[in-house]
Every structure is written in C-alpha cells, then in structure tokens.
C-alpha cells in the first residue's frame, strides 16, 4: 500500500511539474480554490490550477502568464490562475 501511494504521488508530481510544456495547460492539473471563487467550494467552480513549486518559476511558484490566486501559499504547491 505504501508503494502504491508513493507511486501515485510521484506520478502526480511529475505530471504537474511538466504541465507548463503542454498546449492545453489549463486542462491539466488539480483544480484549486481561488480567492475570487468565494469562501467555500460549495456551489462554486474551482478556477485555479495547483502548481508544484519547481526551479525556474517566479517567486510566487506560478509559471509565466499565471498569477497566484489562493488564500495562502502551500509548502509544495501554489494555486495559480491565468
């Protein structure tokens, strides 16, 4: 079970870390709650995309053309929006 969890985490990490190379960048990744979406997820769309913090990104953890839109910064990832 632990191996499966590590494998799934590694696959998600690699998919999100390489997502900025894709043309359909907004369709890939994990949706997250932006401040503009409202106070809760109930009845609201999640308009942000979770980005893994990797080298080469700006100080906000988002790729070029995207901005930080979350309430607080994560340790491994940030919620970004185009």
UniProtKB/Swiss-Prot annotation:
Matching Gene3D superfamilies, A to Z?
A: Anthopleurin-A
Q: List the disulfide bonds.
A: 32-79, 34-69, 62-80
Q: What is the species listed in this Swiss-Prot or TrEMBL entry?
A: Actinia equina (Beadlet anemone)
User: What is the protein name for this chain?
Assistant: Delta-actitoxin-Aeq2c
- Taxonomically, the superkingdom here is Eukaryota
Please list the residues that make up the propeptide: 20-26
Q: Is Transmembrane given among the entry's keywords?
A: no
Provide GO CC annotations from the record.
Answer: extracellular region; nematocyst
Compartments where located: Secreted; Nematocyst
- Signal peptide interval: 1-19
UniProt-recorded Gene Ontology molecular function terms = sodium channel regulator activity; toxin activity
**Which residue ranges run through the membrane?**
none
Q: Does the keyword Disulfide bond apply?
A: yes
State what this protein does: Binds specifically to voltage-gated sodium channels (Nav), thereby delaying their inactivation during signal transduction. Causes death to crabs.
């Amino acid at each position: 079970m632990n191996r499966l969890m590590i494998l799934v985490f590694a696959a998600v990490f690699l998919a999100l870390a390489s997502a900025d190379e894709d043309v359909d960048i907004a369709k890939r990744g994990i949706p997250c709650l932006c401040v503009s979406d409202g106070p809760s997820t109930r009845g609201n769309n999640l308009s942000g995309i979770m980005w893994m913090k990797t080298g080469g990104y700006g100080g906000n953890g988002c790729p070029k053309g995207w901005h930080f839109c979350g309430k607080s910064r994560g340790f491994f990832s940030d919620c970004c929006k185009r």
